[in-house]
């Protein structure tokens, strides 16, 4: 029997969500363009979800869609839409509406305690990470014992440790673990992210640039402190 030409599988991806708080298309376009210009390697042509929960009913979706795409972002879905007329306009644009409603509650699966004295897997990179490279540590921590160039990307489901100059992007807790942290001996990143909460380079406090720093989430907000 021949193999099927296609196969459908469930998967998950880390996507940025753009929350629109203003219905003026030009204001939105300019604000997004500034963000894209700050981190073009990360945001140019990036897939995003647009959250329209705070937009007034009757906002011109066609113009807002054009404003977002003109800034260089690629819309993959819309969330937070409650207005029926807006929903119809979004559907006519050929974009999917993403539901954020509460699903049916399932009985929790029994928790199985992991065996004791089993070491946690860690991915270790001993060489420089060049521009354009992406390193992904699935279900584990990532340690880089070298420099990370601008345009390079580190992704880990666990913590990220960089023992060198960090000029690229670091995304810890990629699977959603808000307890993950980023440790860096020389911070100069284009972007840092933990469980989807991120800072672009201009949001990192200036006094920490080039310094040893630890980043973590506190009350779902990125927090930074010196790494002693």
Curated annotation (Swiss-Prot):
GO biological process: cell morphogenesis; division septum assembly; regulation of cell division; regulation of cell septum assembly
SUPFAM superfamilies on file: Cell-division inhibitor MinC, C-terminal domain
Domain of life: Bacteria
Gene3D superfamilies assigned to the protein according to its UniProt record, in alphabetical order: 2.160.20.70, 3.30.70.260
Keyword Iron-sulfur part of the UniProt annotation: no
Keyword line: Cell cycle, Cell division, Septation
A Pfam family reported for this protein in Swiss-Prot or TrEMBL: MinC_C
HAMAP family: MinC
Subunit structure of this chain's protein: Interacts with MinD and FtsZ.
Function as written in the Swiss-Prot or TrEMBL entry: Cell division inhibitor that blocks the formation of polar Z ring septums. Rapidly oscillates between the poles of the cell to destabilize FtsZ filaments that have formed before they mature into polar Z rings. Prevents FtsZ polymerization.
NCBIfam families reported for this sequence: minC
Family: Belongs to the MinC family.
Name the UniProt record assigns to this protein: Septum site-determining protein MinC
Organism of origin: Yersinia pestis
